[in-house]
UniProtKB/Swiss-Prot annotation:
NCBIfam families the UniProt entry points to: RdgB/HAM1 family non-canonical purine NTP pyrophosphatase
Lineage, opening ranks: Eukaryota, Fungi, Dikarya, Ascomycota, Pezizomycotina
Organism this protein belongs to: Podospora anserina (strain S / ATCC MYA-4624 / DSM 980 / FGSC 10383) (Pleurage anserina)
Subunit note: Homodimer.
GO BP term, example: nucleotide metabolic process
Enzyme Commission identifier(s): 3.6.1.66
Catalysed transformations (reactions): ITP + H2O = IMP + diphosphate + H(+); dITP + H2O = dIMP + diphosphate + H(+); XTP + H2O = XMP + diphosphate + H(+)
The protein's name in its UniProt record: Inosine triphosphate pyrophosphatase
Binding site for Mg(2+): 40
PANTHER family per the UniProt record, alphabetical: INOSINE TRIPHOSPHATE PYROPHOSPHATASE, INOSINE TRIPHOSPHATE PYROPHOSPHATASE/HAM1 PROTEIN
Length: 188
């Protein structure tokens, strides 16, 4: 078994996100977890992630990894964007589809931004991954956010098994950049 060279404290209360992050990063990077109730500012995805990362590092008093995800509809100039969690909670999968009824363009992008901070006072470093797809009526299990309505190459995220999704998702693309950064830090 490969021993982890790095450890990150992933700040999330979302068990599905934690499971995906562990599946992608381990064993190369050991993932511990802490759930903190962090206030989220309004702003761009990058601003939200940087602020969340700084707050988490201060609360924990050490290194942290945070994540923010958005779903951007091409026809709506990237809305709902970083507010997807609130849109989904208010109007559900059907409501999100209804937002695009007047538009031919159902294109969307899933964007995941991780922020890593070495601790309080350290500037967060961002790692972003994007997957382009489209919005479709819900298909597959509905136990993980908007996965049933985001289609990539003929399958919704919800229709994919975990290994398949973890190869192509916005989250896996962002984490690949994090892994690359950690590898460079080891040789620096």
């Amino acid at each position: 078994m490969t021993e982890a060279r790095h450890q990150v404290n992933f700040i999330t209360g979302n068990a599905n996100k934690l499971s995906e992050v562990k599946a992608i990063l381990e064993p190369a990077i050991s993932v511990t977890n802490q759930s903190l109730d962090l206030v989220e500012i309004q702003g761009t995805l990058e601003e939200v992630t940087i602020d969340k990362c700084r707050r988490a590092a201060e609360l924990v008093g050490g290194p942290v990894l945070v994540e923010d995800t958005c779903l951007c509809f091409d026809a709506l100039q990237d809305l709902p964007g970083p507010y997807i969690k609130w849109f989904l909670g208010s109007i559900g999968h059907e409501g999100l589809n209804n937002m695009l009824l007047a538009y031919e363009d159902k294109g969307a992008k899933a964007v995941c931004t991780f922020g890593y901070s070495a601790g309080p006072g350290h500037e967060p470093i961002l790692f972003q991954g994007i997957t382009h797809g489209k919005i479709v009526p819900a298909r597959g299990p509905s136990n993980f956010g908007w996965d049933p309505i985001f289609e990539y190459e003929g399958k919704t995220y919800a229709e994919m098994d975990k290994a398949e999704k973890n190869k192509i998702s916005h989250r896996s693309r962002a984490l690949a950049k994090l892994q690359e950064w950690f590898a460079k830090e080891m040789t620096a």
